[in-house]
Amino acid sequence: MRSIRPLLAATGLVAALALTATACGPTEEEGADKPAATASGSTEKGGGIPADLADKLKKHGVDPDKWRDGEWKNWDKDKWLREAKDFVNPVIEGLWKPDRMKSAKDPAKTMSAGDISGDQGVTDPEPRPVTAEREKTPYHNYAAPVGKVFFDSPKGHMVCSGTVVKDPKNPGKSNLVWTAGHCVHAGSAGGWYRNIVFVPAYNDKGKSAAALRNAQPQEIAPYGAYWADWASTSGEWIKDGGPTGGEGAPYDYAVLHVKPEQGTKSLEETVGNALAVNFDAPEIARISAMGAWGYPAAPPYDGLIMHKCVDRPGRLSISPATPTMYRIGCSMTGGSSGGGWFSEGSDGKLALVSNTSIGPVTSGWLAGPHLGEGAEQIFTMMSDKYGAQ
């Protein structure tokens, strides 16, 4: 019989995340009179692509005007930028309208039992299923740092989850978002995804599809859509990531830097808080509970409602040559990918320690990477690069 200690810890963990929300969210009056912000980044007057991005596109043989007018839909291998240094994500004004967001699909990373037989020596028994619980609304009061990551892939409009994280070089004014590598890059078979945006507090009041049918844009994206002007993921994910995670799964993490709308506050100031990232979490046996938050989109879920799972973590090994991953019981499905996993540190404060990467075809559990030295290097690089922005 499982110990009741994780259940006690879980209660504290849920309360701790609720306490992180300090934002005074959009008021009813603001929602009625103001359209949702759509982060325009540093676009030139008239909606043009910034000169630096235009030059970068030209360097790769892409006409900036044609890109804006639909050339981004060309996924031919010679046009699909792949290397870490080649990320481009020009803002296309008005692209992510509410209906486009609602039509986005999950980039499912599912595995069969045979996919995880590489090293059973460090794989614990499969956890009991934990039914995901709906987050309380409004989300900006209970899980302010959590939101959705939208992007385009060769398969169409896609969606993941993400978390606003603290920026050590920009305290209190972070524009960094943590998500999964497979939410920004296709891995070994492809390149960078396109039109990547972060939408904090998506569907803030947790309304149903029917209730949102005639909703105003600010009901879908109360703080607008923040376009990523840079993304970074692990070299291992770019090299080894696959449709079911593969040997890239233990390195399936990414950091986005998003650009606030000109003249507005940082993302952290806007939503009211951000989570620290802990790259030195204790060994799994010493962690009594982890909580995963996200927006599951594959059946039986529809991607509109934020959910959470809390469980004592176990170990999952994909290969003897790769780091052991965390695994928890959770019924969340695709769409929750990239969502943060949180745990209390020795100081009693909540921190992000992983993100949703993979799960089985039948759901029932989720696995996420251990964030170690490699993840910290990527994060530090992003903080150093954008610390003053």
Map each language-model feature to its residues.
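Catalytic nucleophile loop of clan PA
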Residues: S331-N355
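Conserved catalytic-core segment of clan PA serine endopeptidases
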Residues: R134-A144, F150-S153, V165-P168, H185, ...
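N-terminal low-complexity, Pro/Thr-rich disordered segments
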Residues: A21-Y139, T244, Q389
